[in-house]
Protein backbone atom coordinates (compact mmCIF):
# COMPACT_ATOMS: atom_id res chain seq x y z
CA UNK A 1 0.00 0.00 0.00
CA UNK A 2 2.82 2.43 0.85
CA UNK A 3 4.40 1.76 -2.57
CA UNK A 4 1.08 2.62 -4.26
CA UNK A 5 0.82 5.89 -2.29
CA UNK A 6 4.41 6.70 -3.23
CA UNK A 7 3.65 6.10 -6.93
CA UNK A 8 0.58 8.32 -6.65
CA UNK A 9 2.61 11.07 -5.00
CA UNK A 10 5.06 10.96 -7.94
CA UNK A 11 2.21 10.94 -10.47
CA UNK A 12 0.62 13.89 -8.70
CA UNK A 13 3.96 15.73 -8.61
CA UNK A 14 4.13 15.39 -12.38
CA UNK A 15 0.57 16.65 -12.78
CA UNK A 16 1.29 19.57 -10.45
CA UNK A 17 4.43 20.41 -12.46
CA UNK A 18 2.32 20.50 -15.64
CA UNK A 19 -0.23 22.73 -13.88
CA UNK A 20 2.49 25.07 -12.62
CA UNK A 21 4.11 25.39 -16.05
CA UNK A 22 0.65 25.99 -17.52
CA UNK A 23 -0.23 28.64 -14.91
CA UNK A 24 3.02 30.45 -15.60
CA UNK A 25 2.42 30.31 -19.34
CA UNK A 26 -1.12 31.66 -19.02
CA UNK A 27 -0.64 34.30 -16.35
CA UNK A 28 3.07 34.97 -16.34
CA UNK A 29 2.94 34.81 -12.54
CA UNK A 30 6.29 34.64 -10.77
CA UNK A 31 7.74 31.10 -10.70
CA UNK A 32 8.58 31.20 -7.00
CA UNK A 33 5.06 32.30 -6.10
CA UNK A 34 3.54 29.57 -8.26
CA UNK A 35 5.80 26.92 -6.77
CA UNK A 36 4.93 28.05 -3.25
CA UNK A 37 1.25 27.81 -4.13
CA UNK A 38 1.84 24.32 -5.51
CA UNK A 39 3.71 23.17 -2.40
CA UNK A 40 1.03 24.64 -0.13
CA UNK A 41 -1.75 22.86 -2.02
CA UNK A 42 -3.24 26.07 -3.40
CA UNK A 43 -2.59 24.98 -6.98
CA UNK A 44 -3.87 21.63 -8.21
CA UNK A 45 -4.59 18.85 -5.76
CA UNK A 46 -8.02 18.04 -7.18
CA UNK A 47 -9.40 16.04 -10.08
CA UNK A 48 -12.71 16.44 -11.83
CA UNK A 49 -14.68 13.19 -12.01
CA UNK A 50 -18.13 12.24 -13.17
CA UNK A 51 -20.44 10.27 -10.93
CA UNK A 52 -24.09 9.47 -11.65
CA UNK A 53 -24.16 12.00 -14.47
CA UNK A 54 -22.78 14.90 -12.46
CA UNK A 55 -19.28 16.28 -12.18
CA UNK A 56 -17.49 16.70 -8.88
CA UNK A 57 -14.00 17.41 -7.62
CA UNK A 58 -12.13 14.85 -5.57
CA UNK A 59 -8.96 15.49 -3.59
CA UNK A 60 -5.76 13.89 -4.85
CA UNK A 61 -3.05 12.46 -2.61
CA UNK A 62 -0.23 14.89 -1.85
CA UNK A 63 2.36 15.42 -4.57
CA UNK A 64 5.97 14.46 -3.91
CA UNK A 65 7.53 17.87 -3.17
CA UNK A 66 11.03 16.83 -4.22
CA UNK A 67 10.06 15.57 -7.66
CA UNK A 68 7.71 18.51 -8.22
CA UNK A 69 10.42 21.04 -7.38
CA UNK A 70 13.07 19.28 -9.48
CA UNK A 71 10.83 19.11 -12.57
CA UNK A 72 9.70 22.74 -12.41
CA UNK A 73 13.23 23.96 -11.68
CA UNK A 74 14.57 21.89 -14.58
CA UNK A 75 12.03 23.46 -16.92
CA UNK A 76 12.89 26.95 -15.68
CA UNK A 77 16.61 26.32 -16.23
CA UNK A 78 16.23 24.59 -19.61
CA UNK A 79 13.09 26.18 -21.07
CA UNK A 80 14.75 27.42 -24.24
CA UNK A 81 16.40 24.06 -24.99
CA UNK A 82 13.18 22.17 -24.22
CA UNK A 83 11.05 24.43 -26.41
CA UNK A 84 13.62 24.17 -29.22
CA UNK A 85 13.54 20.36 -28.92
CA UNK A 86 9.75 20.45 -29.20
CA UNK A 87 9.93 22.78 -32.22
CA UNK A 88 12.41 20.58 -34.07
CA UNK A 89 10.36 17.44 -33.36
CA UNK A 90 7.20 18.80 -34.94
CA UNK A 91 6.17 18.00 -38.49
CA UNK A 92 5.28 20.58 -41.11
CA UNK A 93 1.60 19.99 -40.33
CA UNK A 94 1.95 20.99 -36.67
CA UNK A 95 3.51 24.28 -35.63
CA UNK A 96 4.74 25.09 -32.13
CA UNK A 97 2.45 28.11 -31.88
CA UNK A 98 -0.62 25.99 -32.66
CA UNK A 99 -0.01 23.34 -30.00
CA UNK A 100 -2.73 23.14 -27.39
CA UNK A 101 -1.35 24.84 -24.24
CA UNK A 102 -2.09 21.87 -21.98
CA UNK A 103 -0.39 19.46 -24.38
CA UNK A 104 2.60 21.78 -24.68
CA UNK A 105 2.94 21.92 -20.89
CA UNK A 106 2.78 18.12 -20.63
CA UNK A 107 5.64 17.88 -23.14
CA UNK A 108 7.60 20.59 -21.33
CA UNK A 109 7.27 18.88 -17.95
CA UNK A 110 8.08 15.46 -19.38
CA UNK A 111 11.20 16.71 -21.09
CA UNK A 112 12.21 18.67 -18.00
CA UNK A 113 12.07 15.51 -15.93
CA UNK A 114 14.84 14.00 -18.05
CA UNK A 115 17.04 16.91 -16.99
CA UNK A 116 15.86 16.68 -13.38
CA UNK A 117 16.05 12.95 -12.73
CA UNK A 118 18.78 10.69 -14.06
CA UNK A 119 17.75 7.80 -11.79
CA UNK A 120 14.21 7.00 -12.97
CA UNK A 121 14.12 4.76 -16.03
CA UNK A 122 13.14 6.57 -19.22
CA UNK A 123 10.19 4.22 -19.95
CA UNK A 124 8.68 5.07 -16.55
CA UNK A 125 8.91 8.81 -17.19
CA UNK A 126 7.55 8.43 -20.71
CA UNK A 127 4.67 6.24 -19.52
CA UNK A 128 3.72 8.69 -16.76
CA UNK A 129 3.47 11.63 -19.17
CA UNK A 130 1.72 9.56 -21.83
CA UNK A 131 -0.83 8.60 -19.15
CA UNK A 132 -1.21 12.29 -18.26
CA UNK A 133 -1.74 13.04 -21.95
CA UNK A 134 -4.34 10.27 -22.12
CA UNK A 135 -6.24 11.85 -19.22
CA UNK A 136 -6.70 15.04 -21.30
CA UNK A 137 -6.84 13.76 -24.89
CA UNK A 138 -8.13 10.85 -26.95
CA UNK A 139 -6.49 11.57 -30.28
CA UNK A 140 -3.08 11.75 -31.87
CA UNK A 141 -1.60 13.68 -28.93
CA UNK A 142 -1.01 10.38 -27.11
CA UNK A 143 1.17 8.96 -29.91
CA UNK A 144 2.90 12.30 -30.44
CA UNK A 145 3.74 12.61 -26.73
CA UNK A 146 5.11 9.07 -26.67
CA UNK A 147 7.27 9.60 -29.76
CA UNK A 148 8.58 13.02 -28.72
CA UNK A 149 9.42 11.99 -25.16
CA UNK A 150 11.09 8.79 -26.36
CA UNK A 151 13.20 10.73 -28.86
CA UNK A 152 14.11 13.37 -26.26
CA UNK A 153 15.07 10.73 -23.69
CA UNK A 154 17.59 9.28 -26.14
CA UNK A 155 19.09 12.72 -26.78
CA UNK A 156 19.44 13.51 -23.07
CA UNK A 157 20.41 10.07 -21.81
CA UNK A 158 22.09 8.65 -24.88
Explain the meaning of each model-derived region.
Residues 1-158:
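N-terminal interaction/assembly modules
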Amino acid sequence: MAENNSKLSFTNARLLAVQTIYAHMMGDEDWNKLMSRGLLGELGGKALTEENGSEKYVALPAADAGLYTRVVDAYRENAEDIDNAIRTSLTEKISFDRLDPTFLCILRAGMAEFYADSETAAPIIINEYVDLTRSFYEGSEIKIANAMLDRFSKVIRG
